Amino acid sequence: MPVFQTKRFRPSTSAGSTLGDRIGQMYRAHLSKHPFLLFGLPFLSLMVAGSFVLTPATALRYERHDRKVQQVSQQEALALGIKGPDGDGENDIKMNPRRRVLGSEKEEYYRLMAKDLDNWEQKRVQRWKGEPDGRLS
């Protein structure tokens, strides 16, 4: 029986192999010898470059969002509590009874601190007929 050769078979570069094939073969051959240089370094540089490219894009996104959101002054906030026209003719603009008149933060703080939060009673909400009320007994 003949003995097999220990040399690897390397096909000759024929006219049929393209430049891309030859570059790919060389890349794969050198990849096992220098993995970080040929794979890791290009990957890391691509990530860093992508970060620098995408930074202005994200800044533009947030600037566009900030243009949409506008800060409302206290007078405008009070004006938002007014109801629109009802159509009755007399006073087309009526005050919303649920509108909360905003004062200073100190006034609100002292108003909340003055409430007696220790004396309270839990009351059940009245249910419609036929609606389960959640009681187990």
Swiss-Prot record:
<dbReference type="Pfam" id="PF14138">
    <property type="entry name" value="COX16"/>
</dbReference>
<dbReference type="GO" id="GO:0033617">
    <property type="term" value="P:mitochondrial cytochrome c oxidase assembly"/>
</dbReference>
<keyword id="KW-0472">Membrane</keyword>
<feature type="transit peptide" description="Mitochondrion">
    <location>
        <begin position="1"/>
        <end position="11"/>
    </location>
</feature>
<feature type="transmembrane region" description="Helical">
    <location>
        <begin position="35"/>
        <end position="55"/>
    </location>
</feature>
<keyword id="KW-0809">Transit peptide</keyword>
<comment type="similarity">
    <text>Belongs to the COX16 family.</text>
</comment>
<keyword id="KW-0999">Mitochondrion inner membrane</keyword>
<keyword id="KW-0496">Mitochondrion</keyword>
<keyword id="KW-0812">Transmembrane</keyword>
<keyword id="KW-1133">Transmembrane helix</keyword>
<protein>
    <recommendedName>
        <fullName>Cytochrome c oxidase assembly protein COX16, mitochondrial</fullName>
    </recommendedName>
</protein>
<dbReference type="GO" id="GO:0005743">
    <property type="term" value="C:mitochondrial inner membrane"/>
</dbReference>
<comment type="function">
    <text>Required for the assembly of the mitochondrial respiratory chain complex IV (CIV), also known as cytochrome c oxidase. May participate in merging the COX1 and COX2 assembly lines.</text>
</comment>
<dbReference type="InterPro" id="IPR020164">
    <property type="entry name" value="Cyt_c_Oxase_assmbl_COX16"/>
</dbReference>
